[in-house]
């Protein structure tokens, strides 16, 4: 009951809002004529709110000042003899009714604009002109009758009359003002006079009109004439010659026939008519105009005339129900994005096609094959952009270039034949063609645009034709499966990030002709171990596989997989190029006193880097030189704290959380120098050196490492715990034999993360020697549970080892994975190579296995950690 009462009160309040409030009116009077001193017309306002005009001639305009009766008048009586209502004379007033004289001829601009309580009005015979916005925004007005005498109806005369449902327009006017009924949503139908010759701009825009008959004499339908109206059906007369921009856009039309008489088409005439299903263009029409049917998402049936010569840009763009269309043989020109976003499955361009604009067939979700007609020598950019199902393409035999982004994002395209005539492959031409494996560049190819083959991750190899002189920025960036790169003699420059993330390439030869190499050219090539430059190159050379300028000024590129964990930048180097050490596995880098500049992203992705030496004379470090994916713990800086502060001033800080040793030089001895029981020639030196330098292992006391000593289960877990940064572990282990403090946290952490289990329900046996199969289980568990790496797809055949059957069932998968990864290789004996799964591991063996494991997961982690290809 309470809810019902509230509803009634709400309705009453809304109704009352439409009625002017009753209040006492103070009588007043005055003159308001437009002639001489204004005395030709007088006005009188009585106590009841009745406003009476008497006199002869015109009432004055009130354009710049409000009339004195604006908020008092309720009923208006205009006396006989008055010929004109002045501009703004009743605008915004509270009047509810207006009585007009038979002598009236003109209603001026906004004379009754905004009379929101006025519900109806009758204009007497004799009225010739209804001025601009004369009754606009009269939101209670429901009907208007115009007399036969009306000759002119001004722009926006009835705009915003949201309750207007009935209008009678007499014969006589040749056109209706612009925006005449705009926003009149209750106006569902109207009878137009046969005298009309044109429908002006936005005359029925955003109007509720549903059905209408356009008079036969109309030749022009203006811009937005029916835009966003409720129109459901239209017959365009044969006499119409001009249709303006968006004339029927966003209406509710379901079908349309465009007559042959149309000679001038505007843009987007039927765009966004989401109910439009059928469109017929009559014979004689020569062009589908710009965006004519754009985003008509229900359009499925289109008939084009045999006289058609061109389909303009975006003509059918976004018509997602359009699956078939027959193109006339006469249609030879297609504008930008003409069919973009449609669901056409088969497009057959006529043999005489002479022009395909930008993106004509772009973003078509189901297009799988296409043949472009011979005769085309060039096509627009982005022609097939984003066509994710496109698999087969036949290009015209005379094509001279693959246009910019022509096949960008065509993720199903596996192979393509380029005509011998192709001399240039444009910017991003094949970018993101992730399935492309088979493409042969023509012998006559002269160049590539930026990122031409960007992220073609399935390309098996890269061979640059002999005629190419420059490689643009990012041209083969992200071709991660390419195992080789072949560059021609004659190549003079390699652009910025040209081969970035070609992660399967292990070596590269730089031709003698190369004069410049851009920053990050070889960044992200995580398997690259050697860069070679011919002795005849005047600009570059390599020292131990590291690329530098021949004058010794710049270190250009350090191969990410070059052996070793320390590197001393050669004396004399002044600059480290952008991305020079990108993704390396180095732990310590020493820079010479000659160094002055470190370029952008120089040490990005160096997740192993812990120690860095910088000279006092360094002048510039790029803000992002080493912040990303670096975990430098110690910087040895030859200068003072004040010098470092000035160096950092342009930015914020280079070494957040890093210990900076001022006025210092880095001295980190090798394992052989640290430990008296480690032979400098030992096979285990690389493993011991890495584990000690990376903080994974330490000595056993004094100057001893005990390389032949036993490795315990707790020690292996502790090493992995250190590798993970000693994360916090919570109580919850079932093991009762964890007596020593140094390993309690690490074992609890490993158990909680599913890396290890006990030797029984309550014991872990931390001091027991770790077996080879236990190491395998622990390492594979760590890779999966902590790092998220899955090596299960590649398992070795353990039956190849004489003792393969002796591997415990619980360890069999992990051992098979470890052998396949090269972490466990077996022990050589006179009787063959044995796994010895239950055998122990010495500390030097453990260091070697852990170093191999770290190198393996480090590569995978660097691949995972990269934000994106450059």
Predicted regions and their residues:
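Sec-dependent signal peptide cleavage junction
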Residues: 16-28
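Bacterial N-terminal signal peptides
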Residues: 9-17
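Feature responds to low-complexity, polar/acidic, surface-exposed segments characteristic
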Residues: 669-685, 693, 698-745, 753-773, ...
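Consensus positions within tandem repeat domains that build extended binding/scaffold surfaces
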Residues: 86-89, 109-111, 131-134, 154-157, ...
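Structural signature of tandem-repeat unit edges
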Residues: 50-56, 71-84, 93-106, 116-129, ...
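Bacterial N-terminal signal peptides that target proteins for export
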Residues: 1-9
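Surface-exposed repetitive/solenoidal architectures
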Residues: 25-94, 113, 203, 225, ...
């Amino acid at each position: 009951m309470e809810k019902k009462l509230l509803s009634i009160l709400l309705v009453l309040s809304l109704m009352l809002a439409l009625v002017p409030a009753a209040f006492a009116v103070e009588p007043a009077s005055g003159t308001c004529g437009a002639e001489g001193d204004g005395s030709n017309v007088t006005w009188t306002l009585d106590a009841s709110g009745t406003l009476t005009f008497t006199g002869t001639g015109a009432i004055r305009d009130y354009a710049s000042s409000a009339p004195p009766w604006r908020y008092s008048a309720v009923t208006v009586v205009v006396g006989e003899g008055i010929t004109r209502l002045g501009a703004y004379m009743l605008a915004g007033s509270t009047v509810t009714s207006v009585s007009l004289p038979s002598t009236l001829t003109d209603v001026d601009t906004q004379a009754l604009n905004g009379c929101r309580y006025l519900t109806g009005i009758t204009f007497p015979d004799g009225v010739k002109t209804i001025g601009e916005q004369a009754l606009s925004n009269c939101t209670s007005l429901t009907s208007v009758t115009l007399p036969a005498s009306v000759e002119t109806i001004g722009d926006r005369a009835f705009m915003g009359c949201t309750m207007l449902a009935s209008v009678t327009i007499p014969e006589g006017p040749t056109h209706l003002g612009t925006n005449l009924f705009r926003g009149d949503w209750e106006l569902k139908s109207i009878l137009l006079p046969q005298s009309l010759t044109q429908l002006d701009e936005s005359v029925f825009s955003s109007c509720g009109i549903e059905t209408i008959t356009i008079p036969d004499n109309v030749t022009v339908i203006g811009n937005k004439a029916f835009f966003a109206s409720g129109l459901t059906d239209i017959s365009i007369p044969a006499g119409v010659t001009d249709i303006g921009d968006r004339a029927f856009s966003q209406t509710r039309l379901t079908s349309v026939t465009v007559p042959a008489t149309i000679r001038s088409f505007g843009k987007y005439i039927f765009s966004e008519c989401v109910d439009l299903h059928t469109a017929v263009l009559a014979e004689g029409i020569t062009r589908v105009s710009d965006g004519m049917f754009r985003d008509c998402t229900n359009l499925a049936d289109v008939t084009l005339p045999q006289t058609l010569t061109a389909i303009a840009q975006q003509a059918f763009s976004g018509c997602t129900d359009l699956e078939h269309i027959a193109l006339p043989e006469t249609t030879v020109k297609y504008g930008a994005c003409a069919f973009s976003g449609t669901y056409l499955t088969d497009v057959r361009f006529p043999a005489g096609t002479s022009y395909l604009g930008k993106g004509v067939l772009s973003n078509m979700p189901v297009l799988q094959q296409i043949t472009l007609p011979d005769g085309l020598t060039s096509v627009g950019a982005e022609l097939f952009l984003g066509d994710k199902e496109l698999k087969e393409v036949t290009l015209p035999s005379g094509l001279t270039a693959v246009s910019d982004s022509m096949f960008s994002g065509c993720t199903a395209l596996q192979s393509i034949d380029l005509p011998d005539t192709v001399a240039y492959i444009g910017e991003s031409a094949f970018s993101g063609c992730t399935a492309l494996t088979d493409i042969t560049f023509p012998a006559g190819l002269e160049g590539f645009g930026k990122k031409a083959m960007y992220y073609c991750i399935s390309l098996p190899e890269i061979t640059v034709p002999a005629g190419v002189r420059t490689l643009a920025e990012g041209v083969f960036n992200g071709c991660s499966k390419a195992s080789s790169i072949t560059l021609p003699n004659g190549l003079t420059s390699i652009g910025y990030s040209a081969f970035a993330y070609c992660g399967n390439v292990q070596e590269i030869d730089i031709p003698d002709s190369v004069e410049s190499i851009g920053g990050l050219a070889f960044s992200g090539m995580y398997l690259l171990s050697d860069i070679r430059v011919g002795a005849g190159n005047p600009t570059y050379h390599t020292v131990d596989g590291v690329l530098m300028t021949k004058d010794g000024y710049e270190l250009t590129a350090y191969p990410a997989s070059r052996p070793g964990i320390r590197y001393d930048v050669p004396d004399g180097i002044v600059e480290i190029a952008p991305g020079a050490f990108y993704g390396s596995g180095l732990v310590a880098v020493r820079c010479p006193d000659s160094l002055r500049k470190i370029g952008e992203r120089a040490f990005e992705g160096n997740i192993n880097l812990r120690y860095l030496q910088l000279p006092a004379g360094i002048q510039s470090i790029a803000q992002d030189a080493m912040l990303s994916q670096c975990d430098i713990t110690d910087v040895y800086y030859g200068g003072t704290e004040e010098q470092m502060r000035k160096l950092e001033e342009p930015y914020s800080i280079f070494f957040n959380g890093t210990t900076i040793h001022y006025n210092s030089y880095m001295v980190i001895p090798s394992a052989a120098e640290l430990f008296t029981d480690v032979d400098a020639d030992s096979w285990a030196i690389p493993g011991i050196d890495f584990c000690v330098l990376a903080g994974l292992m330490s000595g056993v006391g004094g100057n001893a490492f005990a390389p032949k000593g036993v490795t315990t289960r707790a020690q292996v877990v502790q090493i992995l715990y250190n590798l993970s940064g000693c994360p916090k572990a919570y109580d919850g282990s079932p093991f009762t034999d964890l007596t020593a403090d140094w390993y309690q946290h690490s074992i609890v952490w490993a158990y909680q993360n599913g890396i290890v289990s006990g030797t029984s329900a309550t014991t872990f046996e931390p001091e027991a020697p770790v077996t080879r199969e236990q190491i395998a289980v622990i390492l594979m568990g760590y890779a999966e549970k902590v790092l998220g790496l899955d090596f299960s797809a590649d398992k070795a055949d353990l039956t190849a080892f004489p003792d393969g059957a002796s591997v415990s069932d619980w360890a069999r998968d992990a051992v098979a994975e470890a052998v396949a990864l090269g972490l466990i290789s077996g022990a050589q004996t006179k009787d063959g190579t044995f796994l010895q799964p239950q055998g122990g591991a010495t500390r030097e063996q453990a260091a070697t296995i852990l170093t191999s494991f770290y190198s393996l997961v480090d590569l995978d982690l660097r691949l995972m950690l990269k934000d994106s290809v450059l």
